[in-house]
């Protein structure tokens, strides 16, 4: 007797066949549309139990990576969302999601959370508008409340630098964040941007980390919120040295090599985003099953 496919299997099969709505999913499942919606609602990224269950799949010593992903609409409407856009628009509109994952160098990323990040225009009591930094803090607090273990936070450049440092110290959670070249710091009695600081430390004045092929200089700097470390990272792209910057509150507990490995591990959340972007044009509930 053939085995009845589970709902997650039905969803995956449907999406492989380019299905982009709940209505289109029905022929691939033994359930009706209303029953599919109810089943999806039982397994969400929002509950404490879900966070705990997903976190159990992560390796020891994993870092919590938080980022945003924009998922474009599949057509003129997105089922279940009262939002339309002009077919004449030059830019395809979509919805922004907040995502979080536990990542570790050399290990598969473990998705923890995915939810809509609403605009000010769509603000409601149940779906409040938050800035990027407010959203990051909210996600971390949810994970802490669920007892999700984390060795530290890995954040991209859209999150507020000073607010992230303050939050890091208040909660004793170290952070590693990409910094922009125009970020101003105090270094050896001088106030200058990271871009200007990097000119004092070109590649030949930085240590080579052969594992990555990067040249890195770690410096102690300060801002109004206090002191922290900045990593000037030089890497070759198309034969030319280019630099990016990371700032860290890990202090002496993190070696440069371990910080670089942590940042490399952050790519895991980008891998998850590729999965979202390729397959997610349907309601958010579908994602819950596909990443389970």
Model-derived features with residue positions:
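Active-site-proximal, Lys/Arg-enriched surface segment
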Residues: 32-107, 217
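Short linear Ser/Thr-Pro motifs
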Residues: 21, 34, 86, 248-249
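Short helix-capping/linker segments at secondary-structure and domain boundaries
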Residues: 17-20, 104-110
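Single, function-defining residue in the core of a domain
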Residues: 1-2, 8-11, 62, 109-292
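Gly/serine-rich nucleotide phosphate-binding loop at the start of the catalytic core
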Residues: 1-43
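A residue-level signal for conserved active-site and pocket-lining positions in enzyme catalytic cores
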Residues: 25, 100, 175
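Conserved active-site and cofactor/substrate-binding residues in soluble primary-metabolism enzymes
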Residues: 20, 95, 267
């Amino acid at each position: 007797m053939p085995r009845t496919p589970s709902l997650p299997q039905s969803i995956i099969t449907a999406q492989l066949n380019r299905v982009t709505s709940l209505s289109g999913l029905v022929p691939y499942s033994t359930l009706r549309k209303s029953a599919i919606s109810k089943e999806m609602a039982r397994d969400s990224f929002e509950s404490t139990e879900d966070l705990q269950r997903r976190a159990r799949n992560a390796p020891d010593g994993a870092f919590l990576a938080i980022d945003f992903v924009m998922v474009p609409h599949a057509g003129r409407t997105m089922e279940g969302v009262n939002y339309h856009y002009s077919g004449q628009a030059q830019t395809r509109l979509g919805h922004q999601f907040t995502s979080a994952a536990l990542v570790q160098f050399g290990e598969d990323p473990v998705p923890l959370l995915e939810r809509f990040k609403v605009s000010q225009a769509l603000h409601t009591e149940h779906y409040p508008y938050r800035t990027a930094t407010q959203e990051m803090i909210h996600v971390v607090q949810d994970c802490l409340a669920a007892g999700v273990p984390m060795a530290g936070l890995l954040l991209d450049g859209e999150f507020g630098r000073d607010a992230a440092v303050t939050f890091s110290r208040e909660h004793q959670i170290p952070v590693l964040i990409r910094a922009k070249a125009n970020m101003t710091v105090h270094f050896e009695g001088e106030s200058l941007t990271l871009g200007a600081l990097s000119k004092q430390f070109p590649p030949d004045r930085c240590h080579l980390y052969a594992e990555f092929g990067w040249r890195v200089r770690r410096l102690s700097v300060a801002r109004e919120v206090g002191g922290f470390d900045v990593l000037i990272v030089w890497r070759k792209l198309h034969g030319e040295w280019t630099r990016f910057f990371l700032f860290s509150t890990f202090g002496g507990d993190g070696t440069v090599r371990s910080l670089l490995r942590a940042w490399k591990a952050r790519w895991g959340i980008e891998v998850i985003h590729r999965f979202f972007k390729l397959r997610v044009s349907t309601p958010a509930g579908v994602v819950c099953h596909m990443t389970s």
